[in-house]
Amino acid sequence: MAASAALFSRLRSGLRVGARGLCTRLAPPPPRTPEQVTEIANRGGSKAQGPQHQPGSEGPSYAKKIALWIAGLLGAGGTVSIVYIFGNNPVDENGTKIPDEFDSDPILVQQLRRTYKYFKDYRQMIIEPTSPCLLPDPLREPYYQPPYTLVLELTGVLLHPEWSLATGWRFKKRPGIETLFQQLAPLYEIVIFTSETGMTAFPLIDSVDPHGFISYRLFRDATRYMEGHHVKDISCLNRDPARVVVVDCKKEAFRLQPFNGVALRPWDGNSDDRVLLDLSAFLKTIALNQVEDVRTVLEHYALEDDPLEAFKQRQSRLEQEEQQRLAELSKSNRQGLSFGSLASRLWPRSKQP
């Protein structure tokens, strides 16, 4: 009993101590100063505005890294493949390697320099004409060489592309093509110089010229590529520039020699069009007047929106002036004739013995 009473008294004293400690812990904190309250509020605001972790935000970042790695590997593999393919020596028909100026370099340097040369030559092929002399030398006697050269664009000048769901792409012939060729072939060496590719333009030229009036054909690879335009450089034609006329629907096509060109409006497919007939009359007038330098004539029409219409108006005005001059001359002749008749009546000639 004594032991039980002692144990019970110890438990009661322990509970009292525990209750006293609990009351101490649950007691209210001491009052804070206004500065402490402001500091605590600022800390809480900065934590609330700080970066918050969003679930799943690591997923897109990981995917981007994987995509960049794959793109880098593909780019590196493509670069190595290009250098390997275009960096080897060219081979002949028997499969034997053809030596070049890069054989003395280390292998990697050889590959890189050959690849660079290949793409440089390819770019040069696109920008520059295929040859500094696009046409052969003029014909000599006993063969006939027309005194002038006429350079014609195909699309927009002679043909108009049309597309329909039933037929697809078709090219419509401009009215007056046959007349143009027949009247100008004896006076002009006719050359088709088009910005179209040879694969597209060759059969079209065959269709518009079944009688063979066209002397030569030049395609896109013969143009000079400048600022997004295919320019026709007359200096590469191997002909006297003073006797070359370029007909195109884009002034940029003859920008290097602006006074050698006649810019027409692009044909829209109208079947009542008569521009080629007017062009034939204009060029025929130049040739029949034996103009030494066509640039002196074409310079007057270079600033006109419609050179052929300006030529027709000037021609009509000259015809009216000529008719007026002839009328005045005829009137003066009639007056002179009537005066002579009156004088002969007043003073008859003496009869011969």
From Swiss-Prot:
Region (Disordered): 24-59
Swiss-Prot/TrEMBL GO biological process terms: mitochondrial membrane organization; protein dephosphorylation; protein import into mitochondrial matrix; release of cytochrome c from mitochondria
Membrane topology (UniProt): Single-pass membrane protein
Alphabetized InterPro entries for the sequence: FCP1_dom (IPR004274), HAD-like_sf (IPR036412), HAD_sf (IPR023214), TIM50 (IPR050365)
Mitochondrial intermembrane compartment segments: 87-353
UniProt keyword annotation of Membrane present: yes
SUPFAM superfamilies (alphabetical): HAD-like
Family in the record: Belongs to the TIM50 family.
Protein known as: Mitochondrial import inner membrane translocase subunit TIM50
Organism expressing this protein natively: Mus musculus (Mouse)
